[in-house]
């Protein structure tokens, strides 16, 4: 899928916002930790529920936790350690963009994901 429909920033933005959900998955790529990248032979992978990530930017910088939820519509992930209290006093997860995290541990229970890693592996 190519998002380069035009050189105009407004059209670039529009193509991201209007992308169908099955193509938005490509926006969820996150960097792997150096040890994990060396072990798997891949630099980036899409973030999934169950992965352990380290937050690199924002108020929760340095927090490590499991991914609880992935929101394809808003292009945000929710991590166990990143919570805040809302106006009702309830604890809610804070939305984080996938580009602002680094995957520390990958959930490899899915065979399809293992095939993706094999396909992407550097030769």
UniProtKB/Swiss-Prot annotation:
Swiss-Prot/TrEMBL GO biological process terms: cytoplasmic translation; ribosomal large subunit biogenesis
Q: Which SUPFAM superfamilies match?
A: Translation proteins SH3-like domain (SSF50104)
Which UniProt key words apply to this protein?
Ribonucleoprotein, Ribosomal protein, RNA-binding, rRNA-binding
> Which domain of life does the protein's organism represent?
Archaea
Gene3D superfamilies named among the record's database cross-references: 2.30.30.30
Query: What Gene Ontology cellular component terms go with this record?
Result: cytosolic large ribosomal subunit
Q: Name one GO molecular function term.
A: rRNA binding
UniProt xrefs under Pfam families? KOW (PF00467), Ribosomal_L26 (PF16906)
Q: Which SMART domains match?
A: KOW
Main role? Answer: One of two assembly initiator proteins, it binds directly to the 5'-end of the 23S rRNA, where it nucleates assembly of the 50S subunit. Located at the polypeptide exit tunnel on the outside of the subunit.
Complex formation = Part of the 50S ribosomal subunit.
Query: HAMAP family in the record, alphabetically?
Result: Ribosomal_uL24_A
Describe the family membership recorded for this protein in Swiss-Prot or TrEMBL.
Belongs to the universal ribosomal protein uL24 family.
Q: Which named protein is this? A: Large ribosomal subunit protein uL24
Per the UniProt record, the source organism is Pyrobaculum aerophilum (strain ATCC 51768 / DSM 7523 / JCM 9630 / CIP 104966 / NBRC 100827 / IM2)
Q: Which gene encodes it?
A: rpl24
